[in-house]
């Protein structure tokens, strides 16, 4: 479903609406079972919700749509039982979750590899070649949202310009694994910088230095006790721990 300007935003709004309802459904089911297990919840999210959010990511995956990530954050904050305005930096760090942009971008790069091997008689290959010839190297405002330009920009950003120049790599599986790790490392560094640059997080960073899921999320099985610790660590309780 595209708009008259060939935008995916209308379709994404529909997908994200369904995905958010699925998150609520998962939460209700787990409440009925009287459990809110960390591993189970996010396995269900990754298996049932994430595929809905990343539908057709091969095409739009290199564009960071906030509406997609908002559902991911909605699920994370509902699990932690914190307010919607809780800083996203704390949410990602506490759960050790990475933005879905990493997965969507990899889908686009994976599709780019597939396009390189298609014969020119195939319509997807013809569309790609036309887009590439018209836009790559002609980075005016009108061309910056081109799909091929986005692919090239991704390779350049993460230090793999040679892959674009060579129109591929020898071992695609190994490269995608390497690219994913590079994206993860860059995000970890960005997360750390945000944590250290803000006075608002001075208390949180005194006991949070590694980007990984906190052990108490699985060790504390009584939800009400876990929720108290979550709110205390994030400074969203009655005690003003950030001053």
Residues covered by each model-derived region:
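Nuclease-adjacent, charged terminal/linker segments that flank catalytic cores
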Residues: 113-117, 122, 126-133, 147-157, ...
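Residue-level preference for nonpolar/small residues embedded in alpha-helices
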Residues: 84, 142-147, 221
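Helix/loop segments that flank and initiate small ligand/metal-binding modules
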Residues: 153-243
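Long, internal protein-protein interaction and assembly surfaces
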Residues: 96, 137-141, 147-151
């Amino acid at each position: 479903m595209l708009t008259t300007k060939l935008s995916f935003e209308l379709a994404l709004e529909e997908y994200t609406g369904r995905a958010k309802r699925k998150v609520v459904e998962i939460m209700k089911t787990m409440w009925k079972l009287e459990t809110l297990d960390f591993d189970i919840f996010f396995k269900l999210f990754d298996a049932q919700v994430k595929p809905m959010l990343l539908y057709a990511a091969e095409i739009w995956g290199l564009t960071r749509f906030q509406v997609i990530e908002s559902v991911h954050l909605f699920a994370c904050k509902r699990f932690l039982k914190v307010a919607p305005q809780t800083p996203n930096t704390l949410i990602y760090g506490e759960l050790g979750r990475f933005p879905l942009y990493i997965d969507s971008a990899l889908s686009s790069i994976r599709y780019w590899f597939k396009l390189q091997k298609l014969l020119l008689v195939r319509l997807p290959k013809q569309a790609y070649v036309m887009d590439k010839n018209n836009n790559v190297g002609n980075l005016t405002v009108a061309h910056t949202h081109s799909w091929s330009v986005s692919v090239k920009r991704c390779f350049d950003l993460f230090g793999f310009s040679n892959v674009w120049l060579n129109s591929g790599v020898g071992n695609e599986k190994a490269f995608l694994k390497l690219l994913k790790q590079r994206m993860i490392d860059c995000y970890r560094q960005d997360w750390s910088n945000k944590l250290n640059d803000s006075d608002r997080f001075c208390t949180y960073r005194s006991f949070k230095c590694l980007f990984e899921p906190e052990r108490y999320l699985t060790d504390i099985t009584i939800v009400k006790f876990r929720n108290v610790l979550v709110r205390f660590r994030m400074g969203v309780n009655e005690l003003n721990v950030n001053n």
